[in-house]
A protein has these predicted regions:
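A residue-level signal for conserved active-site and pocket-lining positions in enzyme catalytic cores
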Residues: 29, 70, 154, 194
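Metal-dependent DNA phosphodiester-chemistry modules and their immediately adjacent helices/loops
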Residues: 199-214
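Modules that initiate DNA replication and primer synthesis
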Residues: 139-187, 197-198
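Phosphate-handling DNA/RNA-contact segment within nucleic-acid enzymes
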Residues: 2, 6, 48-151, 165-168
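TOPRIM metal-binding catalytic domain and adjacent DNA-binding surface shared by DnaG-type primases
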Residues: 1-62, 66-69, 101-105, 179, ...
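RNase H-like polynucleotidyl transferase catalytic core
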Residues: 130-135, 182-192
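Class I S-adenosyl-L-methionine
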Residues: 30, 123, 174-178
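Phosphate- and divalent-cation-binding pockets in alpha/beta enzyme and binding domains
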Residues: 121, 193-194
Length: 214
């Protein structure tokens, strides 16, 4: 549990980073189907004047995590160049469910995605969605958050490739679905995540994967 001082520091940083979002970051997000308006809605930003623990990510895209009470509890970072690793997070930071507010929506369905940007894309189609940054970030108490939904769609990245013997996205989907009541796995085409599918096929085809918007 973060102290009030820590939460305030993180929330102020999230606001500052969002205000400083760069044209390069906006161009990257736009190419991934996330508009400037949507980026602002989720407080996506650019790391400038970093707080302690964020110094190694200056210039990266900031992805803040908020509670259902709109309190910032952590960050994920996405680099803009082709370097590795593509994503980062402060050392020692606890993992959280991204866009957890979606679990409070009055909806018959919700989608559990593998990643933050995928959750944003799905939410913007009108279907509530949360993001989990990989199977290792799934926690034993998460299933309780989805009680009350008629159906919970689980969509992992389809990491199938000829040069890979494992499929982490499929493992993620199986693990989550095995613990969440009323869940259904939706498998994407090989090599695709939700964002890839959206960019290739559009909003209607994406929402049709989970029964359409209703």
């Amino acid at each position: 549990m973060l102290s009030t001082t820590q939460s305030t520091l993180l929330s102020e940083a999230a606001h500052r980073y969002a205000q400083a979002i760069s044209e390069e970051a906006l161009a990257y997000l736009d190419a991934r189907g996330i508009s400037e308006v949507t980026a602002a809605r989720y407080s996506l930003g650019t790391i400038v004047d970093p707080i302690e623990g964020h110094q190694g990510y200056t210039g990266w895209i900031s992805i803040p995590y908020f509670t259902a009470l709109d309190i910032c509890v952590g960050f994920k970072f996405r680099r803009l160049d082709d370097g590795k690793p593509k994503y980062g997070a402060p050392v020692g930071q606890k993992s959280h469910l991204y866009n957890v507010t979606a679990t409070t929506y009055d909806s018959p369905k919700i989608v559990i995605c593998e990643g933050e940007f995928d959750a944003i894309i799905m939410n913007e189609t009108g279907i509530p969605a949360v993001g989990v940054p990989g199977v290792a970030a799934w926690k034993p108490f998460y299933p309780k958050l989805f009680t009350g939904f008629d159906v919970i769609y689980v969509i992992g990245d389809n990491d199938t490739r000829e040069d890979k013997e494992t499929n982490p996205g499929a493992e993620f989907a199986r693990r989550v679905a095995s613990e969440v009541v009323n869940s259904q796995i939706v498998q994407l085409p090989p090599g695709m995540d939700i964002t890839d599918f959206y960019l290739a096929n559009g909003k209607d085809e994406l929402t049709n994967l989970v029964g359409g918007v209703r």
